[in-house]
Amino acid sequence: NRWLAAYTIVHGVEASPVERTAAGELQRYLETITGIRLPVTNAAAPPSPCEFLIGRTGRSFRADVAGLTDDGFAVRRCGGLTAIEGTCGRSTLYGVYYFLETYGGCRFYARDCEVLPSPEAFRLPDAIDDRCSPALSFRDVDWFEAHDAAFAAKLRINSDHNRVHNAAYGKTMHYAGDRFVHTFSAL
């Protein structure tokens, strides 16, 4: 995985707290998997041929999020550039977790149960062009583990029911007043 050492993680100059979390999570998981700690910088730094671009960076290489629904994201890779961008900051974080699952082989089963690939197994294809839109605008499960905002983000849950979210994990969706279920009468 020496090829990875040439990379930098780049977020926008005015990145939101959740986009900074997304860049930090990518850095943390790549370091845990490979032992290589990539630097994180903002887009004011000069471009390099090997970058992970997180969110709206202003760089010419980007992922196309046009036409995606709320919380949609896109992942694009060509050569040494990989862009992960969402329709909002929270969906950029979802895109990072999708990238780690789909191309990194990571599995997030519970707050204290994650399966990460061996360093030798971590490989990226030369080209990626994925676009993802959630089928449902409101997503939740009533499972104690998912009440943790950090773990809920890995599951791409956006409900505020029994969760205390903060700026690091993005805004949540509130639905049908203070109810979680049996909401028909509230509509």
Stretch-by-stretch model annotation:
Residues 1-74, 120-129:
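Acidic, contiguous N-terminal accessory segments
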